[in-house]
Amino acid sequence: MIICDFHNHTCFSADSDSTPESMIEKAIDLGLSYLCMTDHMDLDFPYTELDFTFDVSEYFKKHDELRQIYGDRIQLLTGIELGLQPGVYADLKDLLSKWDFDFVIGSSHLVDRVDPYFPIYWQDKTESAGILRYFETILENVADFDDIDVYGHIDYIVRYAPSKAAHYSYQKYQEILDEIIKTLISKNIGLELNTAGFKYGLGFPNPHMDILKRYRELGGEIITIGSDGHVPEHLAYDFKKVPEILKACGFDHYTIFQKRKAEFIKL
């Protein structure tokens, strides 16, 4: 059994209405030992109707209060999911220097200031070109900002591609994906296994198992597990599949973080 969820969102994120209490109580019901909440911090997000930032002081205050209430039943950790894009790296570095997070995810939610969630992203390009450009931006991000513990859902874009995963494979983008993986390993940045891919009907987690396997083949060890749940019902989503996926990809462990330090848990 996987005993932790290290990617989930509460009402501190613009796309969730779930209270932290509801997520914690669900995690306890599921028998989890650790819950690391990772709310969105997407600075300079171009879609102004949604504010993907939050008051970090209030976030830490709330988490401290919740540890007093629930700390004897589950270990609560304070994480954050940073939306990476050019122009925000200095502000993110400043943020992380001021706050003592347990865990930091870096993610790509924008490609050249457009969210591939929206159909307009795909209107002026082929599907293959749109996916390739997304991977290029990951390399650009980690070249300039590497103060993260894992890179989140590195093939996130496939969730929203016009054909979803029908024409997608690791092999099709192997050259750039290998470059991403090698770069992450060289910077001691891990990957996450994000089970939301199953929720979106892809039939695999994000990233695809072939990417996880290649990461392991190239020496990668840091692998966290997250549901990307935005409601309690999606917490630990399809985690029952995770142990066999990890083993098939060459892992005998998964990873948690406390105070930005990796700890390995045997399968």
PLM region descriptions:
Residues 1-6, 10, 16, 20, ...:
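Charged catalytic cores and adjacent phosphate/nucleic-acid-binding surfaces used
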Residues 38, 107, 154, 194, ...:
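Conserved residues at the C-terminal ends of beta-strands
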Residues 1-86, 95-98, 160-162, 167-171, ...:
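An N-terminally biased module of ancient metal coordination in phosphate/nucleic-acid-related enzymes
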Residues 2-5, 34-36, 75-79, 102-105, ...:
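Structural preference for beta-strand elements that scaffold enzyme active sites
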Residues 49, 53-186:
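Extended substrate/RNA-proximal surfaces in nucleic-acid metabolism proteins
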Residues 6, 12, 45, 52-54, ...:
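Phenylalanine-focused residue identity feature
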